Amino acid sequence: MQPYSNFSGLQQRTNNQVVIGSDMLAGTNKKGVLVPDADGYYLTPLGAYGTRNSAGMFYEMASGVSMFNPDSPLMRRVKKGVLFMEYKHPEPYRKDGTRMNEHEYLMRIRQIDDDRVCAHIKELILVDSTDEKGLPIKLVLGKCKPYGPFGKYFEASITNPSQNTYCSVRSITQDDPMRGIKYTREISTWDMVGEGGIYGANKWNSPALENYEDQLMVITPDTLYQVQRERERQINMGFECSDITNVTDLAKSLGWDISPVKHRRPGFMR
């Protein structure tokens, strides 16, 4: 299986800014055929670390591999059997067509829309492999089974020997643009991308399609603070809150302080 990695996520512009974007990964075996196991799950290439994308950015291995620690949020979802793949990346628009603000879109990419599910991911596997140049990488494989309203599209793509299956990770990365390195801070899931399937990985690796600037959105510490405030408001009203509104660990991994600013009162007001 030959991976062509080009990840999606929140890409850092400055120490206090990250940007939501989308990049692609194409995966298939040498014959273009993936065979399911006895339970109907396909061992599907999802991503790779310790490798570069077509823009030359290097996906640092240690931070990527750390996302697969047993106690990570990602692996907890795998253990609970609730890691699902969506058909296409979430777009930063509300149902009425208006553009989401930053904290709305951040919450959206951290959740799964049941109406967009195309597969269930049963297991994640890290294996030692090599890239197209023979350099060592960590390949991410997932045991995926067609499921949900868009499961038929995933199955049609994965069983067609003439058609590539494209997946793209939803992750949060911090970038070092001077050194050309991406550090992974959080993985939400993987999405199937490419409407109806794409013939050949090179079509998506062309320079004209490498950058998705129209989908980028700047995220700052204030964005996480707004998500945190919304979580506190829901708790105070007695509502149950999902993990997507808990940004404490995410803020720590980004090195951001999202605690409210306390203004000292002037002496004459004490």
Curated annotation (Swiss-Prot):
Which residues carry out catalysis? 89, 168, 191
* InterPro entries with a match to the protein in the record: Peptidase_S80
Q: How is it modified after translation?
A: The self-cleavage of the C-terminus allows the activation of the protease.
The organism encoding this protein is: Pseudomonas phage phiKZ
GO aspect biological process, one term: viral procapsid maturation
Give the UniProt subcellular location, in the record's own words.
Answer: Virion
Q: Name one GO cellular component term.
A: virion component
Mutation effect (residue 89 to A): Complete loss of enzymatic activity
- According to its UniProt record, this protein's enzyme class is hydrolase
Tell me what this protein is called: Capsid maturation protease
One example of the protein's molecular function in GO is: serine-type peptidase activity
- Stated EC number for the protein is 3.4.21.-
Which keywords fit this entry according to its UniProt record? Autocatalytic cleavage, Hydrolase, Protease, Serine protease, Viral capsid assembly, Viral capsid maturation, Viral release from host cell, Virion
Main localisation: virion
Question: Could you tell me what this protein does?
Answer: Serine protease that is responsible for cleaving many of the prohead proteins during a major morphogenetic step in viral capsid maturation. Cleaves the major capsid protein at 7 [A,G,S]-X-E recognition sites.
